[in-house]
């Protein structure tokens, strides 16, 4: 009548060969491609990936703490993240971590590094291209800039470009929040076109 308990089994293991991959958002196509590449790379090593998807509005560091207690990973890859979540609780995590898509240089943790894009510069470059080609009524779909650091950085890059070109950006009219999924983006685009048909 013995029923194995997975949590007990993992607690009993002194070492794990798993690398936890925490993915914020279940429908982000960019993250899906990154996860696939990470899994391919790890197949060539002695490690395996333990992929954990979570809602994009949840706290990734709290989830990492749970994973560290229950699964004891060798390290954690964070796909998506909010720097304020790391500032609050990351010191409790002892394994190495890597932020992917977010910059970690302002976070004071020796066991945390990052591989990222300069979202401000990239968004500014994209917006510069549109404005230099005489597009001025430009709609932007993005995440909630109060919750998503990446969305906030991209929005700031767009604003910098508008300012550089001597233009104002009307956020109420031309910015629409959405989650990082095709369905949410479609619904946001419909809302945006209803309030700004001049796009």
What residue ranges belong to the model's regions?
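Short hydrophobic/charged patches on amphipathic alpha-helices used for structural packing
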Residues: 8, 62-65, 87, 127, ...
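Short helix-capping segments at alpha-helix termini
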Residues: 42-45, 164-169, 195-197
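Flexible loop/hinge segments that line or gate small-molecule binding clefts
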Residues: 78-124
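Hinge/beta->alpha junction and helix N-cap segments in small-molecule ligand-binding domains
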Residues: 24-33, 51-59, 114-125, 141-163, ...
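Residues that mark the start of a beta-strand
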Residues: 18, 135-137
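Amphipathic helical "hinge" segments at domain boundaries
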Residues: 3-65, 72-75, 156-159
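Periplasmic-binding protein-like
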Residues: 22, 72-80, 139-142, 175, ...
């Amino acid at each position: 009548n013995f029923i194995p308990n997975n949590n007990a089994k993992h607690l009993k293991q002194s070492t794990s060969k798993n690398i936890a991959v925490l993915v914020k958002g279940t429908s982000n196509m960019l993250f899906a491609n990154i996860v696939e590449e990470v899994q391919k790379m790890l197949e060539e090593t002695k490690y395996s990936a333990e992929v954990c998807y979570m809602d994009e509005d949840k706290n990734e560091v709290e989830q990492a703490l749970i994973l560290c207690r229950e699964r004891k990973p060798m390290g954690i890859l964070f796909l998506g993240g909010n720097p304020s979540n790391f500032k609050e609780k990351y010191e409790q995590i002892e394994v190495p971590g890597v932020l992917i898509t977010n910059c970690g240089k302002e976070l004071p943790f020796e066991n945390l590094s990052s591989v990222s894009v300069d979202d401000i510069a990239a968004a500014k470059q994209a917006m510069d291209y549109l404005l230099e080609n005489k597009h001025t009524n430009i709609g932007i779909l993005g995440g909630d800039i109060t919750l998503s650091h990446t969305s906030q950085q991209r929005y700031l890059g767009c604003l910098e470009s508008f300012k550089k070109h001597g233009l104002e950006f009307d956020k109420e009219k031309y910015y629409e929040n959405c989650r990082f999924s095709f369905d949410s983006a479609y619904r946001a685009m419909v809302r945006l076109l209803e309030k700004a048909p001049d796009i």
